[in-house]
Amino acid sequence: MTNPSFKTRLARNDIVLAPGVYDALSALVAEQAGFEALYLSGASIAYTRLGRSDVGLTTFTEVADTLARITERVRVPVIVDADTGFGNALNTQRTVRGFERAGAAMVQIEDQGFPKRCGHLDGKTVVPVGEMCGKLKACLLYTSPSPRDLSTSRMPSSA
């Protein structure tokens, strides 16, 4: 499914189940099970590559490499967790660009401070609204409408 058709699919306004995957094999299994989309979380990469909790230890490169290996093998869209964008607004823009090149259909960016913590862990901090707006604006300035339209979403860490 191409990104434009994923956008059309999301516009249908019904639930899209996107199971969490952590490598190309788990992605293939999920695709063969019939799922329409997949979700690559920062936690899954931290657990499987580092054997650690999701506390901001993974790098942009580790996530982009894992994403590229997955999208090389599956045809369904992959939503990827960009954590906090791996830095400031310019880093976040670079992250979105890199993830788009690696085949992401959608990128999720959190509004946490550093060090970030997995959503279910205590001790999270939220960045100032202006800082998060700067990150989102940087992403939107990069993601102009195109045949490879990349959607960007935000998950509030306070939820």
Predicted regions and their residues:
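N-terminal amphipathic alpha-helix/helix-capping segment at the start of soluble metabolic enzymes
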Residues: M1-G20, V29
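Generic structural signal for well-ordered alpha-helices
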Residues: N3, A27, A64-L67, T71, ...
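Active-site mouth loops of central-metabolism enzymes
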Residues: A11-A24, L57, V80-L90, R148
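Hydrophobic faces of well-ordered beta-strands that scaffold small-molecule active sites
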Residues: L17-G20, L38-L40, V78-A82, V107-I109
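Glycine-rich anion/phosphate-binding loops
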Residues: P19-Y22, T61-E62, T84-E100, V129-G130
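Conserved, mostly hydrophobic/aromatic
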Residues: D23, A30, D81, G103, ...
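Glycine-rich, proline-tolerant flexible connector loops at the mouths of alpha/beta enzymes
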Residues: Y39-T61, F86-N88, I109-V127
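Conserved small/polar residues in nucleotide/adenosyl-binding loops
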Residues: Y142-P147
